[in-house]
Amino acid sequence: MASGAPPSVDLTSIQWRMPEWVQSMGGLRTENVLEYFSQSPFYSHKSNNEMLKMQSQFNALDLGDLNSQLKRLTGIQFVIIHERPPFLWVIQKQNRLNENEVKPLTVYFVCNENIYMAPNAYTLLATRMLNATYCFQKALTKIEKFPQYNPQEGYTYPKLSNDNLEVDHSNTNEPADENKNQSIENADYSFSPEDFSVVRAFMQSLHSSKEAPDVK
């Protein structure tokens, strides 16, 4: 039986499985998935589940009896909060304060015999924000070359005509991507005041703090 991972180990980076246990039990089911989970390093032997298992080792509790017993105890518990057998179970580690109140601590997924620890809200939000920032910065880098300055209109943003992107590759040996890049560089731009309104407003706010170019 697993003794749990050391405190210094990042459990969110662990994928755990024990196929020989699953095979010996004839597959995973809702009735035995908590027992399977107890073999993993995510499990705590100081939990109420472990105490009840030791007390009833000669009279195994079914899932209904286990949940009923856990509700009468306070402390750390592991319960199934969602199931879609035979492929998915969601297990919650919680601190039960009383019969009607629990404090969720961590969520785990049992998916195709693999057990994962779900990331916390901070990690999930930080990752999403990092990805969004990267994509936004990449977009700004691409549109940075488009602004055109006019002393009467300020900064304007032209629209690329799709007709100028059609290139005949039948009589050339150059790759299609290279020809497309050349066509974009040599394309004829047309501007509509309604186009890129959001981008235009944002970019104008960036340029407003810069000194306008000298006009002779």
UniProtKB/Swiss-Prot annotation:
Keyword tRNA processing: no
GO cellular component, one term: core mediator complex
Extent of the signal sequence: none
Domain of life of the source: Eukaryota
Keyword terms of this UniProt record: Activator, Nucleus, Transcription, Transcription regulation
Segments of this protein annotated with the region Disordered: 157-187
Biological process annotations from GO: positive regulation of transcription initiation by RNA polymerase II; regulation of transcription by RNA polymerase II
GO molecular function per UniProt: transcription coactivator activity
UniProt xrefs under InterPro entries: Mediator_Med6 (IPR007018), Mediator_Med6_fun (IPR016612), Mediator_Med6_sf (IPR038566)
Location relative to the cell: Nucleus
Record-stated family: Belongs to the Mediator complex subunit 6 family.
Function: Component of the Mediator complex, a coactivator involved in the regulated transcription of nearly all RNA polymerase II-dependent genes. Mediator functions as a bridge to convey information from gene-specific regulatory proteins to the basal RNA polymerase II transcription machinery. Mediator is recruited to promoters by direct interactions with regulatory proteins and serves as a scaffold for the assembly of a functional preinitiation complex with RNA polymerase II and the general transcription factors.
Oligomer status and interactors: Component of the Mediator complex.
Protein name: Mediator of RNA polymerase II transcription subunit 6
Organism this protein belongs to: Schizosaccharomyces pombe (strain 972 / ATCC 24843) (Fission yeast)
